[in-house]
Each structure stands twice: as C-alpha cells, then as structure tokens.
Regions:
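ATP-dependent adenylate-handling active sites, centered on carboxylate activation for C-N bond formation
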Residues: 1-170
Length: 170
C-alpha cells in the first residue's frame, strides 16, 4: 500500500525457495489487487556469463510460464568486491561476505541499468534459518533444531530472539 501502483518492484532472484517464494507472493498479491505484474522483475546475477543461480532462476520461472520476468544482470569476476562487502556489512563471516559481495554486485548492476529504480525485495537468509538446503540431506531437521541453532544470528533469528512462540520470532 505504500508503493505507488506504477512503481516497479524488483526481486533479487536466484530461483531458490526463498527468492522464489518472495517473487510468487508479490506476483500473486499484484494480481489479487488488480495491478499489473508487468512492474515486477526477477533480477539474477550472472558472473562472467556462467552462473548456476541464473540457470536455476531461468528454470524456475520457465516452468511456471513466467520466464518473461527474469532479467539477468551480467558482471565480470572483477566486479565482485569482497573488501567492499566487508566495509558495508562490518562482518567477516565467510558466507555473509560471499552473500553481500554478490548482492552488492547485483545492486550495482541494477542501479547502472535502472538509475531511478527504488524498490527491491530480497528473500536471503532462509537457507540459514533452516540450517541449509537440501532438506533431504538434513535428517535431523525439526523446528526445535532450527530454534536451538545458535548460529542463526541474522535478522534477529535464533533461540534468544523468540518473542511470541517457538514457531514465530516476529
């Protein structure tokens, strides 16, 4: 309700469970509101023309007949700057630095292509909150094992962040 009906909305999109859920939720909400989903884009990063995420993103959307929403952002390997990521996130955890390095490169690419774009949505972090994918390899995955994982420091997740119940950390 706070975004004007003509403003474009971008999703940082890998085609995984997190970004896929975010994209499909936004797509569904726009349709339910009678608004055009044409304002929605699924931005995916492709480094040096070779990207497992870009391939996965294309497969995800193509299987749903939504491939027209995908917009790959190409960058060179030199366009990935882990030192900038460390400065921005003030963190040294390897997975956080990797994630931030890619997100910054993707955002720079989007800004270069669309200098007036204002709204981006991201589903990053779900893998960490579920102790990583694929789920079939996580035989001990339960809600309790997730909540007791003290490594879930991101976004206030983790057992110390429980505010209301064992299944909602809102």
């Amino acid at each position: 309700d706070r975004i004007a009906p003509r403003e474009p909305i971008g999703v940082l999109f890998s085609g995984g469970v997190d970004s896929g859920s975010v994209f499909l939720t936004l797509y569904s909400l726009l349709l339910a509101r009678g608004e055009t989903p044409a304002r929605l884009k699924a931005f995916t990063l492709s480094v040096g023309g070779d990207s497992a995420d870009a391939d996965q993103a294309a497969r995800f959307l193509d299987q749903l007949g939504l491939g027209l929403f995908l917009e790959p952002i190409e960058v060179t390997l030199e366009g990935i700057d882990y030192q900038e990521a460390i400065r921005v996130i003030e963190d040294y955890k390897p997975l956080d630095v990797q994630s931030a390095s890619m997100a910054l490169a993707l955002c720079r690419g989007i800004r270069s292509r669309y200098p007036d774009w204002h709204y981006l949505v991201d589903g990053d972090g779900g893998d960490e909150n579920l102790k990583d994918y694929p789920l079939e390899d996580s035989h001990n995955l339960t809600i309790r094992s997730v909540l007791n994982n003290t490594l879930l420091y991101q976004e206030g997740w983790g057992v110390d962040a429980i505010k209301h119940s064992l299944t909602y950390s809102g």
